[in-house]
UniProtKB/Swiss-Prot annotation:
Residues 285-294 have a biased composition (Basic residues). One of its GO terms (molecular function) is phosphatidylinositol binding. It is found in: Cytoplasm. The gene is NCF1C. Residues 1-101 form the PX domain. Transmembrane segments: none annotated. Keywords: Cytoplasm, Phosphoprotein, Repeat, SH3 domain. This is Putative neutrophil cytosol factor 1C. PANTHER family: NEUTROPHIL CYTOSOL FACTOR 1-RELATED, SH3 MULTIPLE DOMAIN. GO terms for biological process: respiratory burst; superoxide anion generation.
Length: 366
């Protein structure tokens, strides 16, 4: 996680937090928007600075000394011609987001470096923590990248995973390369199973589809934009198991947003398609003799139906058990004798003991 202190023209100062993968995507898009200034046509015309490699990126450790720090990178961007330094893409990147108002947790700040861009513009960089140990994975098949921000793979390539996105796209590095890779093309070295996959939650979490999707496989679910579902299993490959009424199946997590959150912002963040599923990969070759442990759709459906039936029984008001306090109180009330109705007083008793008004009413009735 990187922290920036951004000073705007109205002299206001805002602190924003960005992950390296966000900075990487921003840099790639900026180069695509201004190919001449990025040196894509003629390297001598390049004025957009190189993105400095973080210190955990061993393959670029030597190059980092020449590229400078992230602070210098941002300072150079701000000094570029107005069409670049004031373009909406750059300004939007440094605007305060709702997540910036929440302080990062310890897990978020324990990254290899955090840079602070001071308002006086001087280049300072402070190391917050030491080196970070990255997880190592192996490619089970060849993968051809479809965009500049992705990374191509060959079967057997070993990569280090920098960030595991819930979308199923993982940011990885390999020697001097880095980019996004579908998690379905990767397997752990020590086991075919992904130990970080959480357990199913059949109570479900409410989500909304922010993009329509038509099922391709028989175990998938089709949804229209805006439909509400319950997520019962969040898998790291980006294909979550959802429940729509009594139907369960797989759905791309990147097309889902938690209920009650800003849908439009989530829709703008969809920059690529859903990652391929492991079952659709041809010529996949694992180094492990046994396959991954995965629940079948029948198991998901059976467990989900059982949970829903139990929840409906608990919600339905039923008869009280014989030993319950409420039932005992009702039995006690029924067993108590009813009070006797007193006899009607005689006319002589009324004339002797009642008020004059009551006496007159009695006389008129007679």
């Amino acid at each position: 996680m990187y922290m920036f202190l951004v000073k705007w023209q109205d002299l206001s100062e805002k602190v924003v937090y960005r992950r390296f993968t966000e900075i990487y995507e921003f840099h790639k898009t900026l180069k695509e928007m201004f190919p001449i200034e990025a040196g894509a046509i003629n390297p001598e015309n390049r004025i957009i600075p190189h993105l400095p490699a973080p210190k955990w990126f061993d393959g670029q450790r030597a190059a980092e000394n020449h590229q400078g720090t992230l602070t210098e990178y941002c300072s150079t961007l701000m000094s570029l011609p107005t069409k670049i330094s004031r373009c909406p893409h750059l300004l939007d990147f440094f605007k305060v987001r709702p997540d910036d108002l929440k302080l990062p947790t310890d897990n978020q700040t324990k990254k290899p470096e955090t840079y602070l861009m001071p308002k006086d513009g001087k280049s300072t960089a402070t190391d917050i923590t030491g080196p970070i140990i990255l997880q190592t994975y192996r490619a089970i098949a060849d993968y051809e990248k479809t965009s500049g921000s992705e990374m191509a793979l060959s079967t057997g390539d070993v990569v280090e995973v920098v960030e595991k996105s819930e979308s199923g796209w993982w940011f990885c590095q390999m020697k001097a390369k880095r980019g996004w890779i579908p998690a379905s093309f990767l397997e752990p070295l020590d086991s075919p199973d992904e130990t970080e996959d959480p357990e199913p939650n059949y109570a479900g979490e409410p989500y909304v589809a922010i993009k329509a999707y038509t099922a391709v496989e028989g175990d998938e679910v089709s949804l229209l934009e805006g439909e509400a579902v319950e997520v019962i299993h969040k898998l790291l490959d980006g294909w979550w198991v959802i429940r729509k009424d009594d139907v369960t199946g797989y759905f791309p997590s990147m097309y889902l947003q938690k209920s009650g959150q800003d849908v439009s912002q989530a829709q703008r963040q969809i920059k690529r398609g859903a990652p391929p599923r492991r079952s659709s990969i041809r010529n996949a070759h694992s180094i492990h003799q046994r396959s991954r442990k995965r629940l079948s759709q029948d198991a998901y459906r059976r467990n989900s139906v059982r949970f829903l039936q139990q929840r409906r029984r608990q919600a339905r008001p039923g008869p009280q058990s014989p030993g319950s306090p409420l039932e005992e109180e009702r039995q006690t009330q029924r067993s108590k004798p009813q009070p006797a109705v007193p006899p009607r007083p005689s006319a002589d008793l009324i004339l002797n003991r009642c008020s004059e008004s009551t006496k007159r009413k009695l006389a008129s009735a007679v």
